[in-house]
């Protein structure tokens, strides 16, 4: 009863087409049957909706179980060059050599994401840990001004990129650098209008 009622309410408010539904975070082969069960339960109720999951196992997309994969940047090699029309990415905690916005990471590793989004024609970025002010699994709340590692359960900065303020979110220096990366993405798209995508990528 809940899902059809939710869909009807979203349509009534005019936001259904902009809504994205989610089944499970990072499903892998050991939970394939359970994921299929959930997928087959929800799909008939939301037949015209879009589904997105954080997904690093390409086989789930290959089997038509996920419309929009949001892939961990460290796992993108399995998706690049495949027929994925709406590829999103995200990053979480540190992996050597990939874009990341942890406190201990140099800014270039944060900003470089913008160029990568352009080069691989990524359609969106899923913010993992945008404003997570809890310990792992949300057992306790934390003050991000005093504890930057989710109570020593994550790498510092992996769990948030904005701070809570009296009148809304306050951008961290990492969020500002991330914005610069998005400006790089916009610059690449503008360059493409003048010289074409192939030449823009060659210049990169």
Residue locations for each model-derived region?
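Catalytic-core regions of glycoside hydrolase
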Residues: 1-138
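Catalytic domains of carbohydrate-active enzymes that cleave complex glycans
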Residues: 1-32, 41-56, 138-204
């Amino acid at each position: 009863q809940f899902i059809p009622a939710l869909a009807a309410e979203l349509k009534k408010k005019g936001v259904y087409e902009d809504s994205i539904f989610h089944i499970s975070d990072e499903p892998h082969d050991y939970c394939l049957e359970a994921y299929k069960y959930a997928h087959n339960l929800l799909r008939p109720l939301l037949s015209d909706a879009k589904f997105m999951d954080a997904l690093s196992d390409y086989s789930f997309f290959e089997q038509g179980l996920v419309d929009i994969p949001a892939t961990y940047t460290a796992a993108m090699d399995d998706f690049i060059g495949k027929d994925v029309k709406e590829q999103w990415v995200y990053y979480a905690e540190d992996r050597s050599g990939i874009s990341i916005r942890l406190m201990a990471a140099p800014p270039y590793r944060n900003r470089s994401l913008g160029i990568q989004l352009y080069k691989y024609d990524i359609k969106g970025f899923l913010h993992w840990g945008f404003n997570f002010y809890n310990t792992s699994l949300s057992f306790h709340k934390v003050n991000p001004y005093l504890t930057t590692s989710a109570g020593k359960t994550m790498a510092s900065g992996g769990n948030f990129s904005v701070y809570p303020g009296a009148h809304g979110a306050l951008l961290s220096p990492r969020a500002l650098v991330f914005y610069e990366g998005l400006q790089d993405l916009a610059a690449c798209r503008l360059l493409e209008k003048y010289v074409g995508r192939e030449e823009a990528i060659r210049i990169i």
